[in-house]
Amino acid sequence: MLRVKTGFSLGSAMLALALASPSVAQNVDWPTYNADLAGSRYRPVDQINASNFNDLEVAWRFKTDQIGTRPEYKLEGTPLAVDGIIYATAGTRRGVVALDGVTGELLWVHSIREGKRGAASPRALSGRGLSYWTDGTEKRILYVTPGYRLVALDAATGQRIKSFGKDGVIDLKVDFDQDLQGGLETGEVGLHAAPTVAGNTIIVGAAMREGFTPRTHNNTKGYVRGFDVRTGKRMWIFHTVPKKGQFGYDSWHNGSAETNGNTGVWTQIS
């Protein structure tokens, strides 16, 4: 467990050292999971390089043990860094934290208790991260809970955006163009990945159980949807298994498009 905690803390500390550097001309923001929508995972900065890497020291640590019922054991998240603030999903409840990038001070924390629905999630724990959106005035943090809810937060306060969805939340198991086996509480669908924000559209995929271990072929179809970033209104849906009359339906022989599932887009969309 110590190794997992240190991994999160060291990554944050290294970001903190870069943000604290006297050179402020370089863009050290990391505003999306992959740095940018192209998925480059690259920033052209040289404040940390081969000549000084061995001189880095831990500036601060932040432990996530108390954000959930037990310590995290499978850390996969990538924090975002925007204007000197670090945003990350954290803990077994998949809360969201905002930290001062220089000092590590906790600025705010947000989490939702999802009860049985969260416990039954096929994609539990802290997940791979979250997304950031701004129009130059408003700044929002967007993430998907273990129970498959899309949440919009004020980046400055961590409070839910009341005008988004229903009190800042969209139930992704609803308006999904299918009936979920197991219903809202135990229906097998979730998401580890961060939602992708393209312009003013939030793109959300779907995932089933990890490790190619579906209980049945007749399972949830992992459709992809786009939502308006301001209101949460569903803008479009892509059926990964085509419906009757749609392109590709006839290639699913013997009516298999009606019964087959497990076709999620679980990875990070770019």
State the predicted function of each range.
Residues 1-6:
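N-terminal secretory signal peptides that target proteins for export/translocation
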Residues 50-53, 84, 101, 135, ...:
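Inter-blade boundary loops/turns of WD-repeat beta-propellers
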Residues 26-70, 105-119, 159-184, 233-240, ...:
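Aromatic (tryptophan-biased) beta-strands that constitute blades/sheets of beta-rich domains
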